[in-house]
From Swiss-Prot:
This is UPF0756 membrane protein CA_C0092. Signal peptide: none annotated. Belongs to the UPF0756 family. The chain crosses the membrane at residues 5-25, 50-70, 82-102, 117-137. It comes from Clostridium acetobutylicum (strain ATCC 824 / DSM 792 / JCM 1419 / IAM 19013 / LMG 5710 / NBRC 13948 / NRRL B-527 / VKM B-1787 / 2291 / W). InterPro entries: UPF0756_TM. It is a multi-pass membrane protein. It is found in: Cell membrane. One of its GO terms (cellular component) is plasma membrane. Keywords: Cell membrane, Membrane, Transmembrane, Transmembrane helix. It holds the Pfam family DUF441.
Length: 152
């Protein structure tokens, strides 16, 4: 019951904060719980959900290439530009941070910080016009900061 209340609070905040993807996700989880399907679907989502979410996100990002809107010459020209090189470096960094964050949340068992990560993402979406896709990167930064503080 407590988990339902927490999810409803996150749902309300995400609706007010106009974080539609978070609201849909929370609503889907609540519906699955209310229908009693959580015991069947949650284990699969817990195990494979992140992978399939990343597959869909990556596929969506690659659509312009698949549609032929991006040519090989465009990629070549971009890769040698300041923006292209910066994109490569930042992509390398954020991908690394996402991996650190995923391990921090799952393997290291710090999933209790997820509500704070979600609320921060929702607040940024509401007040700064952001898109709430950064909890893994945020948790990666958090994991590195926690590690540095513990060493001090």
């Amino acid at each position: 019951m407590e988990s339902n209340i927490i999810l409803v609070v996150i749902l309300g905040i995400s609706i007010v904060g106009k974080a539609t993807s978070v609201a849909i996700s929370v609503a889907a989880l609540l519906i699955l719980k209310l229908l009693g399907l959580d015991k069947y679907i949650f284990p699969y989502l817990n195990d494979k959900g992140m992978f399939w979410g990343l597959v869909l996100l990556t596929a969506a990002i690659l659509i312009p290439i698949a549609q032929g809107n991006v040519k090989a010459i465009d990629i070549k020209n971009n890769l040698v530009s300041f923006v292209g090189i910066t994109a490569l470096v930042l992509s390398f960094l954020t991908t690394y941070l996402s991996g650190v964050g995923l391990r921090y949340l799952t393997v290291q068992g710090h999933s209790d910080v997820m509500p704070s990560l979600i609320l921060g993402s929702v607040a940024a979406a509401a007040f700064l016009g952001g898109v709430p896709v950064g909890p893994l990167i945020t948790s990666g930064i958090l994991a590195l900061l926690v590690k540095m503080v513990k060493k001090s």
